UniProtKB/Swiss-Prot annotation:
SUPFAM superfamilies: Histone-fold (SSF47113). It is found in: Nucleus. Residues 53-64 are annotated as: Subunit association domain (SAD). It comes from the Eukaryota. Heterotrimeric transcription factor composed of three components, NF-YA, NF-YB and NF-YC. NF-YB and NF-YC must interact and dimerize for NF-YA association and DNA binding. Binds directly with DPB3-1. Residues 1-23, 114-141 are annotated as: Disordered. Ubiquitous. Predominantly expressed in leaves, flowers and siliques. Induction: Enhanced by dehydration stress but repressed by heat stress. This is Nuclear transcription factor Y subunit B-1. GO terms for cellular component: CCAAT-binding factor complex. Keywords: Acetylation, Activator, DNA-binding, Nucleus, Transcription, Transcription regulation. The gene is NFYB1. One of its GO terms (biological process) is response to water deprivation.
Length: 141
């Protein structure tokens, strides 16, 4: 693995322009919130730990997405879907995570199917403004 950070596309930043740091990483507040869930109530997390996890998460996402994208390109498809990501995780040795993610993806698709077309109708569905499903419908991991 290279010593310098690569772009999220996994191409070393050669995808037509440099990626701004704030676009490369998940927000540190989100990272911190997730990390705190694994600690006792009085636990503290150092800035260096948050920064390290932020970097690792970005690298992991790039790693999985790049593998899935390569698969899609070979199959002459332009859109990476959840099944492609699961395939990439299996290919790259993350089999232990597949079953819970398959369950999550199936539930997500089930909820999306139930809510298709209801996002604009004002029917009280739990879609957010961007058309996504709100967190209260999805299982909490």
């Amino acid at each position: 693995m290279a010593d310098t950070p690569s772009s999220p596309a996994g191409d070393g930043g050669e995808s037509g322009g440099s990626v701004r740091e704030q676009d490369r990483y998940l927000p540190i507040a989100n990272i911190s919130r997730i990390m705190k869930k694994a600690l006792p109530p009085n636990g503290k997390i150092g800035k260096d730990a948050k920064d390290t996890v932020q970097e690792c998460v970005s690298e992991f996402i790039s790693f999985i997405t790049s593998e899935a994208s390569d698969k899609c390109q070979k199959e002459k498809r332009k859109t990476v879907n959840g099944d492609d990501l699961l395939w990439a995780m299996a290919t790259l040795g993350f089999e232990d995570y597949l079953e819970p993610l398959k369950i999550y993806l199936a539930r997500y698709r089930e909820l999306e199917g139930d809510n298709k077309g209801s996002g604009k109708s004002g029917d009280g569905s739990n879609r957010d403004a961007g058309g996504g499903v709100s967190g209260e419908e999805m299982p909490s991991w």
